[in-house]
Amino acid sequence: MFFFGTPNKQVSYLPGALSLAICTALGVSPVYAEEPLYRSLIVFGDSLSDNGNAGIFTSDDPLGIYPRQPAPSFLADRLGLAKENSCYGLGPRFGGAIPCAPAPGGLDQQLQQISNSVLTNGPNWGVGGNRTADVLLDVVGPQRFRQLFPDTTVADHNTLTTILPDSSRCGEDGICDPLAGESPYLSPAEVLAATAAFNDPMALQALVDDPNNNITLTGVPFATGQGYLPQNTPVSSDLYFLNAGGNNILDGVRNGTLSLMSMERAATFLSTAGSELKAAGAKYVVMTNAPAIGNTPAVYSQGAAAINYANSGTEMFNDRLRRQVNDVGNILLLDLEGVLELVLDNPAAFGFADINQSDTCYVNCANPHPVYGANGTDPNADMLVFYDAIHPTLAGQRLLGDYYYETLTAAVGFGLLPDLGYQNSRQHRVNIDHHLISQRYRDPFTTVFFGASLGHAELGAGPALNDDYPAWDGFFGMSFAGFENLEWGVGMSYGRSVYEPRNLRLKSRNFNYSAFARWDNDFWFVDGAVGFSDIKYRDINRTIYLGDTFRHRFNASTKGDGYSASLRAGYDASRNLDSHMGPFVSAEWNRIDVNGFNEKTSINLTYAGAYGERRDPLGLWVRGQDRDFRRCKAGFFYNSPKSAEHQWFGEFWLEHTAGDDYADLGIGVNSIFNNWARLPSYRSKNTGFFQNGVGAMVGVSVNDKFRVAADLLVRPEDTVGGLSINYRF
């Protein structure tokens, strides 16, 4: 519950003037710096998300390092995105008597304050006390909300919705006409009447039902009184974060009204908010489930019956939300409940005091801690999970923010798995090229040969960190003399590549199989190959950090396949010489498929579900992915005369690349059954493997059996290359 002082009578709520300021400010869009992963983070939620609209419900940092803020704001910091609240510049923090209201002062001062707030347009719409209905309301605005749910009552809403700006006070169209004296704000008398009834639901409902005042249930935390979608068009790179449900469960606990029907209704509001965002064009939508309310100090002190009752509400709400969100599709659920359960089960592992954290808090609960509490012998909120009876301390908020960040960015690293398989295929291709180029315009020959290549690889592109590491391939082949001027062969190889920037290790091992052939008629030549790769990713290791203390490495493995085809043709432009040289063109195609997998974790990092099953809230399950790579080359070749003691061979070319240089990857949390969403993963346009470049391969025969070659590829962002050998028995 939230309490407000009596509004200062000097505050002027002049309808026409305020409407004029708002209308003047509308149409100006905020500008956020482009980020490689997400453009902006837009937050809707309750006190676990509120960054100042109704307050900030957590502790101060004892060391003064971190600002007082909720977990989504820590997430915004790590993503490098804006985090201001949607009513930034208004409300009690800036002198206003109530949330989203201007400070007392002259008319011009209030107009300027409101205009500045609208222009700032902070992306955090969280409001302490919000229920799930209020999250939907803030997303779609009053008009659309009433179309979707015309029958909500005070019981469905945060009491603050009665006094926040509401564009429906300006008429059905939601557009305030200053000439008609319309305003989204209440008069001072109406504010007084509404706030006086905050602790009396029946009295507040009577005010809402009274047609003779402007008190409504559809106020939103924005000075125009309009919701997010009526004023904004989602951009494909925006990330939408929704969190609510805890207050709905608490209401049911207090009133003894928890039921499957009530929790399903509460979940429906939240899933509908996700559905409305998706329908409007939002691409990345994530939600948290609700924490186990019975394990908070607000309920825990009441005994086992209250704990079990409250936690049954959490179980029902989270299950209904999961089912509904899965029906909408492509919305990721984060296991807030599970992470907090891990912390409460073993607080010392996460940097908190090794005590029963559910039974105590820093301040304002039944049992503030006698040592670390605000009035304890050694006050230190960082040693406690709970700030008050419900909300986490700043240390807890930061831990949750780290969890959100680690989960929402994991797809970036996993998106490099196809590239590792492709890098191995390229090394296999180097060995085939070494054989085909060195034998160009030579008589077909039946033999067995061995090859090996070692290459310098630059893996990582777009949001993925660049990491250089050698890749190698050992090749065994057989060639056969066919009919006149034709040689064909088969080969197999084993190759390996590794990608290991900080906190991530990916290793690919390829078993490659190819069939190849070459033909010439002393003028034209054609060669090509087709191949298949059996790829094993036995080392997929991701390390996460939560807070200052907790560190854990996840292990996983999976398999994949690779397919390839290539064709090259050219002609000898120096037929009067013993050597051969001329132009050529070539085309290569590779496809890499990677199967899905689940990260594995320790049993100590799981919690018990409703039926005793172990649930892993930190590990992820990753869906399969595939990627096409295409290369086209045009250049010149050279082969020295057959009579030369050391036969030189080589190619020089310009190459153009294409393929799947942009991809998202399906990610889900292990503990959330059958829920997943596609998150930003691979962004390699004009970078990484998808750069055009200039390349060359030059080799020489040391003797009749042994050849050595070097290859080099110069691209705008890097230079890669390597060495290869070929021995014919």
Task: Locate the predicted segments by residue.
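Gram-negative bacterial Sec-dependent N-terminal signal peptides
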Residues: 2-32
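Conserved active-site regions of diverse hydrolases
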Residues: 33-441, 454-461
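Active-site pocket-shaping loop/turn-to-helix segments
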Residues: 142-143, 256-267, 557-562, 619-631
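Residue-level recognition of beta-strand termini and adjacent short loop/turns
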Residues: 236, 481-485, 574-576, 643, ...
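Extracellular loop and loop/strand-boundary signature of outer-membrane beta-barrel proteins
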Residues: 305-309, 460-464, 498-504, 512, ...
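Outer membrane beta-barrel transmembrane domains
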Residues: 403, 514-518, 611-729
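Outer membrane beta-barrel translocator domains of Type V secretion systems
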Residues: 419-581, 589, 708-726
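Solvent-exposed flexible segments
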Residues: 588-594
